[in-house]
Amino acid sequence: MDRNFLNESNNSTNNRNKYVIYDEEESKPLFYNYDFRKKNKMVMYLFDWMMVVILLIVGGILFLKVTVRGRLFTLDDESISYPKLPELVPMHVLIPVIIALPLAIIIVVSLIVKRDCHDFHHAILGLAQSLALTLLLTGSFKCFIGGLRPNFLEVCDPTPASIAAGNPPVGFSKIYYDRSICSADDSIVNDALSAYPSGHSSITAASFGFLALFIHAKFKIFDNRGHIFLYVIVSGCIIGAGLIGISRVADYRHTFLNVLAGWSIGLIIALSCYRLNYSSLFGRDNHVSIHSHWLTYWNHHDNLNNNNNNIKNNFDLEKNCNQSPNNIALDELNK
């Protein structure tokens, strides 16, 4: 049998497996409409960005405005009696880094090297979705679970006067106090009560984790080429996120479990958001954006429809455009 025929047969079989076509209306998944998505691409993109803005606003409110759930504490608890040290990586330094660094690399790779605006859009959208979802989830955990920072007592700064003016102690031995005995400002105490999970760790893992997936997909790090510098770039993203998280333990802002929880949240969301915008996480097509995937899908679907129409036309003996031998006029055959 001809080898080319076998290759074409295999390719057609692979295409059928890759692109599942739902011919019957009742067999389609919910909200699965080819024509709507094809005709309303800009509306879908606008909706995605609106969701990002909403998530950022809600997450910011949870972080900055909502009072966290209070925790009871004792005045002789050594685990929350650490000194208040200067932050190794303050938030006003972290935010520009986790935004500017991935943005710069994505611009270079997508716009300068690949010159693909759609790939750039999905990379930026995925990064924004990752940060927005992480901010929302981290803020929710901080508000509804919270936790005492290792330097809580020094930040709280209870004095004899504030202890006397606050709520009386509770518990079996009457040794547990609440935040009412703190003499510091409410905003400072609120931050000291929001140790779980680490916000630095989660948003850094979300940003640098997404960036690591992006670089790995574009350059195919483990593609039997042995380029150590590409491996260093990808692993550097993960190491950077790890070091920023560990810095929060070193300056007594978090315990290691707080940091580990933040890492887990950020990495899981980074993986999810990358897959939302690209064809796979670690497959051979993990560099293909969803836009390119749908273009190929639509073309394949349109070709199938055209082929089906041609087949129907070949059996339609009344159709004038049909050029099958069965419906060509006799006078044309006699020419």
Curated annotation (Swiss-Prot):
GO molecular function, one term: phosphatidate phosphatase activity
Organism of derivation: Dictyostelium discoideum
GO terms for biological process, alphabetical: phospholipid dephosphorylation; phospholipid metabolic process
PANTHER family, per database record: LIPID PHOSPHATE PHOSPHATASE (PTHR10165), PA-PHOSPHATASE RELATED-FAMILY PROTEIN DDB_G0271516-RELATED (PTHR10165:SF108)
Name of the protein in its database record: PA-phosphatase related-family protein DDB_G0275547
Residues of the signal peptide: none
Localization (cell): Membrane
Pfam families: PAP2
Keywords for this protein: Membrane, Transmembrane, Transmembrane helix
SUPFAM superfamilies: Acid phosphatase/Vanadium-dependent haloperoxidase
Family statement: Belongs to the PA-phosphatase related phosphoesterase family.
GO cellular component, one term: membrane
Topological relation to the membrane, as annotated: Multi-pass membrane protein
Lineage, highest ranks first: Eukaryota, Amoebozoa, Evosea, Eumycetozoa, Dictyostelia
InterPro entries the UniProt entry points to: P_Acid_Pase_2/haloperoxi_sf (IPR036938), P_Acid_Pase_2/haloperoxidase (IPR000326), PA_PP_rel (IPR043216)
Membrane-spanning residues: 43-63, 93-113, 124-144, 202-222, 226-246, 254-274
